[in-house]
Amino acid sequence: MHDPRATLLQHNRGHWQGCFIRLDGSGVEQDRFPTSLQVQERDGVIENCLTYLATGEQKSMNFESVPFTMQVNECGGWSLGPSAITPLAWAGELSVVHGDERRRVVARHGFHGLDQVVYIVETKAGGEPCAPSQPLQCTIRTNGDWVIWQPEPHVELLLDARDRHMG
């Protein structure tokens, strides 16, 4: 039987070197910054500590059991969200693990649709994250109401481009 907590730890535990790339609503890089993420289990608690290397600022997220909003697949990939910011705005996060590499996406939707995407490239300690060239400009194509962003080869983000305003 699939144990999401054990699977999450099996594939995500360790020290990850990363590069966060902030994209605007058109898939154009706004800025990027290096990070370090430590994922470990201590006394039954999963501890995640993200360090922004340029400033030394740290953010932590700790939990004993997998949050009810988190889905974990057998390969260690996970999704978290959507988390409501306001009645019409939300954010969601998705992670895909492939061996010692991982890609994460944090998408923020506002009142009128997509506001911002943070594309995260991570490699387990011992390797440098292989971030896309600067500045990143996603290749974009449409398929009906969907927009497909391609930040790098073999990675596609399927986004709902419909306007969300009420009225």
What are these regions (language model features)?
Residues 5-13, 17-167:
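Soluble ligand-binding/transfer domains with enclosed cavities or grooves
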